[in-house]
Amino acid sequence: MEQTFFIIKPDGVKRGLVGEVLKRIEQRGFTIEKLEFRSQVSEELIDQHYQDLVGQSFYPPIREFMTSGPVLVGVISGPKVIETWRTMMGATRPEEALPGTIRGDFAKAAGENEIIQNVVHGSDSEESAKREIALWF
């Protein structure tokens, strides 16, 4: 069975969206294989997670945001879970996310000099899922 990794980001936890996100995962028929609440995430872990972005001019605010508060991380499984979860999340940029997606319903567009608060992360490929699961668990 295919697996993917997800994060409910600090904005999702702070805004009380954990239950809503987990409900959508379960309603879709996916199995929650692992779930862990992290009250604090280190900069080192975030740097490893976003290794392809480290060094980019836009990266420091992402690191700051991802270490700003608690997160919920997990592994879900099911048929075509990577593709389906990414569809359920919606577009990265809130203004492009369709209604009915997690980001379309709950994400906040960034103002000038603000970081996008898009509630969730999901692995973008089978390779990324394996790497991220090994990194976080």
From Swiss-Prot:
Name the InterPro entries on file: NDK-like_dom, NDK-like_dom_sf, Nucleoside_diP_kinase, Nucleoside_diP_kinase_AS
Biological processes annotated in GO: CTP biosynthetic process; GTP biosynthetic process; purine nucleotide metabolic process; pyrimidine nucleotide metabolic process; UTP biosynthetic process
**Full protein name:** Nucleoside diphosphate kinase
Where is it located?
A: Cytoplasm
Per the record, the domain of life is Bacteria
Instruction: Give the binding site residues for ATP.
Output: K9, F58, R86, T92, R103, N113
GO molecular-function term, one example from the UniProt record: nucleoside diphosphate kinase activity
Q: What class of enzyme is it?
A: transferase
Catalysed reaction(s) here are: a 2'-deoxyribonucleoside 5'-diphosphate + ATP = a 2'-deoxyribonucleoside 5'-triphosphate + ADP; a ribonucleoside 5'-diphosphate + ATP = a ribonucleoside 5'-triphosphate + ADP
The alphabetical list of record keywords is: ATP-binding, Cytoplasm, Kinase, Magnesium, Metal-binding, Nucleotide metabolism, Nucleotide-binding, Phosphoprotein, Transferase
Q: Which metal ions or organic cofactors does this protein require, according to UniProt? A: Mg(2+)
The protein's matches in HAMAP family, at most eight in alphabetical order, are given as: NDP_kinase
Organism, per UniProt? Streptococcus pneumoniae (strain ATCC BAA-255 / R6)
Q: What is the lineage of its organism?
A: Bacteria, Bacillati, Bacillota, Bacilli, Lactobacillales
Listed PROSITE patterns: NDPK, NDPK_LIKE
The protein's role, per its UniProt record = Major role in the synthesis of nucleoside triphosphates other than ATP. The ATP gamma phosphate is transferred to the NDP beta phosphate via a ping-pong mechanism, using a phosphorylated active-site intermediate.
Q: How does it assemble?
A: Homotetramer.
Active-site residues per Swiss-Prot or TrEMBL entry? H121
Q: Which family does it belong to?
A: Belongs to the NDK family.
EC number, as in UniProt: 2.7.4.6
One cellular-component annotation, GO: cytoplasm
